Amino acid sequence: EYVWNLGTRSRPNNVYIYYSRLDVGANRVNLAIIARRMASEVFVINSSSSVLTSRPAIGIRIDDDAFFSIHALSSGGADSLSLIQNIHTFFNTEGRRHINWMAVGDFNRAPGRMQEALDSEPGLRNATLIVAPTEPTHRSGGVLDYAVLHNANQTTQNTTVSASIMFNQMRSQITSDHFPVSFVKKR
C-alpha cells in the first residue's frame, strides 16, 4: 500500500495505491488499484488455469464492496472465466456472502463471449453482470476492457453502473493499445 498526497500539507488529498509488479520483464502488464479510501483488506486471487503465465487478480475491500483489477491472457483470455469463478467462490463463503464485488480490466475476450462462458456455469449465470462500454476499447476495434459485477443483495443482477471510454485521456495513452474506460454510478 502506497499513500500519495495529491494536495498539500495543509490540505491533504490522499489516495491509496495498491500495486503488483507482475511483469518483471517488459513491465507492461502490471496491475494497480487507486482508491480515495484506505482498504480494509487486500486480496490476491489466482486463476485455476494451468497456464504458467496466467496473472492473478488483485483486489481491495472497502466496507462491503470489493474491487479487482484483472489482466487476462492475450489471444482470447483463456484464464478470465477461471479468475471470475475464483473471485465468486472466495466471496461465496460464510462471512463473505454479504460483500459485493466488481472485477475490472482487460479480459481479452468480447463481453458476449464472456457472457456465454458465465452462462455455462450454474453458479455464475444469475450471480454476475457484465458492464461494458459500447465503443471499442482496443485498437483492433474490439471491446476487451469491461467489468464483471456481483451484487450480494440481489438474486437477479442489475446495476446502476455504466461504462464509457475516457476520450479526454486518449492522448496520454500513446504506448497502450487499449483505451481507458470509466465506470460511474448512473444518476
Please tell me what each predicted stretch does.
Residues A26-R187:
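Active-site regions of metal-assisted phosphoester/phosphodiester hydrolases
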Residues E1-R28, I34:
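N-terminal carbohydrate-binding/catalytic regions of secreted carbohydrate-active enzymes
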